[in-house]
């Protein structure tokens, strides 16, 4: 019998007998475990061989045998739990232990570095599952980072300095304002073993042609092997950077026929998905990666929803005891902000916008927040920390304003905290704030009626590219802000847009109201090298590594 099954049977027997040694019979024990008399004898003999109990059998009708427990079910349960932790079987661990506080304590104690059978394993604690990793769909901050570890694109952007680098394409050139040519590497393999072909690249780009930032791609052809020509309807100075974004990452052309592709995607990147459940995401270094192989062999993201209510503000890679911590932090390139929806009467009303912006000013929100949040929040006066576009101007409450509707996406505890503070402040002015929590997909599409939306944005390097690119690709913003997005996109592609002025106009009209910049934190380990926090609050897994302990 497998060890795990035998352990479960012993724990069940120990619980049924309340851990007490006793005189009993095979028939009575078999009834407790709902098995045959013969199987019960086999179980007892095997458990006795393991040293868990003693079974002193008595022969004869009416004779009772002696059962003596040498091991407690609790001790064996703990051992089983440790085994499940080492095997990263978090689903089974939760089922075995049951108590959430105990599970959390066990997970935290096993965070950080592990070295098993010659492999370096990194364990990370996170507050929610990462179930959708499909490029081109509505991805949140962390899903965007994970997708970059799984997929490759024609180009990539260096997370540390924002510079453009080669990826699947080793060189490229602009033949004319509307014609670009990319030269691709041969011998690139997908995680499921197949070699990448030009048809995969062409299909990946045609798949995203409906997205606003990629709608100007007129044609994609391969004139010669490993050469890709892209023809545009309008010039785009940003095209090489655009093709390094997550929506433009390369998928196998048969991706729609592959089971559960969104949660178990197949790419050509440095890591492949091994497991993705509600309790755990496990990715493993891809040995056939066309670039430098990752130095950390395996990354396990353990999901513990209970930590969502803690304002940790970042990733936890190390538990509270043991090796000394290394903490890295940065103020996010982005902010929480209010978005007024011009589709509703109150959202479009300038007096409402001015007054709400005044009473829900960044300083008011920080003032009414609990101390644990005040340490992580910094008042925002622009979409970026270096910008000071917003001006706090005293405004009178509009006559007849009695209620407002605020909407945000779920699984984000700070949204609830900020909304609660807003509700408290507005109530003091006799305004009722109705709060709606919706899915991220619903939020992204923006088809629900709401006066105001509570949003957050994290912009990646280079900022002069990603800021407009991020805002332009969210349908919600295009619904709420009635400007000529296509004309602005054309100006941006031509390099004719003053991005700071464009954002200042959005803030001045109160279409967007910056609220809070958040401190991003990684609690790491001193032995980890190459850990550089990116603007998404994560770090490039393939570049990190563990230094061996100092020789004695």
Curated annotation (Swiss-Prot):
This is HTH-type transcriptional regulator SgrR. Activates the small RNA gene sgrS under glucose-phosphate stress conditions as well as yfdZ. Represses its own transcription under both stress and non-stress conditions. Might act as a sensor of the intracellular accumulation of phosphoglucose by binding these molecules in its C-terminal solute-binding domain. Residues 163-492 are annotated as: Solute-binding. Keywords: Activator, DNA-binding, Repressor, Transcription, Transcription regulation. The lineage of its organism: Bacteria, Pseudomonadati, Pseudomonadota, Gammaproteobacteria, Enterobacterales. Residues 1-116 form the HTH marR-type domain. Residues 26-49 bind DNA. HAMAP family: HTH_type_SgrR (MF_01449). GO terms for molecular function: DNA binding; peptide transmembrane transporter activity. It comes from Shigella dysenteriae serotype 1 (strain Sd197). It comes from the Bacteria.
